[in-house]
């Protein structure tokens, strides 16, 4: 059974978009994935996103995706929400991935906006609702036009929110004004998908965040959202400002590269990256050490 959720926080408040650990020869490291998932939940995560962008989903097979979700559910599914990334730019393929994720025990689905083919808003609506219809799991949309090439407009979000299983949105649009209107009008549970904007989005109505830096600072993120919910705005701001070097450092290059580099520095499961992604250079690793130390991360 998944942890308790509410309509306001269907996936909890603090989630980390987990990397996919690989062995030295590039194979899926299921044991490492289970150990990393347990570490992240022990640190304070309410949920984990599996097979997202940070999970190198473009380079894993459908079978690997299912195996990874199954392994993480076995490891932490009784105490954390396991949300499977199943979004592609092919609606039928996404439906197949959604059904597979449901079969292996996922608690929810993350659906990224179709990328490259740039469908119109009606196409986005049909795509998302078809997937939500095909599986019996709650859905978190993922609006990231910088990668997908097309935004989910507010009117479309309002329509999508009428679907009983579309309950949340991960916002990586970087537009607080649009977010403010969309939160107010759609009623969707709003999750920040941009670590630098975690606190600003909480201020305009977000309920939590899907984080990359949660791999290294989950306790601090937990403390920040708890302070905000308790009305201690000053404490939340102090934590946000303390973490600024981490937010900056973890995104000097692609987030999965710095995340796996940071995990390696901490002796946690990560492994190499699959092409076309590559590991950090020695110079990038040294800069990452400086950034993490400036944010109080112990290595």
From Swiss-Prot:
Assembly and interaction partners: Homotetramer; dimer of dimers.
Recorded GO MF terms: 4-hydroxy-tetrahydrodipicolinate synthase activity
One Pfam family this sequence matches: DHDPS
Annotated active site: 142, 170
Keywords of this entry: Amino-acid biosynthesis, Cytoplasm, Diaminopimelate biosynthesis, Lyase, Lysine biosynthesis, Schiff base
Alphabetized SMART domains for the sequence: DHDPS
Superkingdom of the source species: Bacteria
Broadest EC class assigned to this enzyme: lyase
Reactions that this protein is recorded to catalyse: L-aspartate 4-semialdehyde + pyruvate = (2S,4S)-4-hydroxy-2,3,4,5-tetrahydrodipicolinate + H2O + H(+)
Compartment list: Cytoplasm
Name of the protein: 4-hydroxy-tetrahydrodipicolinate synthase 2
Record family assignment: Belongs to the DapA family.
Matching InterPro entries: Aldolase_TIM, DapA, DapA-like, Schiff_base-form_aldolases_AS, Schiff_base-form_aldolases_CS
Organism: Streptomyces coelicolor (strain ATCC BAA-471 / A3(2) / M145)
GO aspect biological process, one term: diaminopimelate biosynthetic process
Function, as annotated: Catalyzes the condensation of (S)-aspartate-beta-semialdehyde [(S)-ASA] and pyruvate to 4-hydroxy-tetrahydrodipicolinate (HTPA).
Broad class of where this protein is predominantly found: cytoplasm
Pathways involved: Amino-acid biosynthesis; L-lysine biosynthesis via DAP pathway; (S)-tetrahydrodipicolinate from L-aspartate: step 3/4
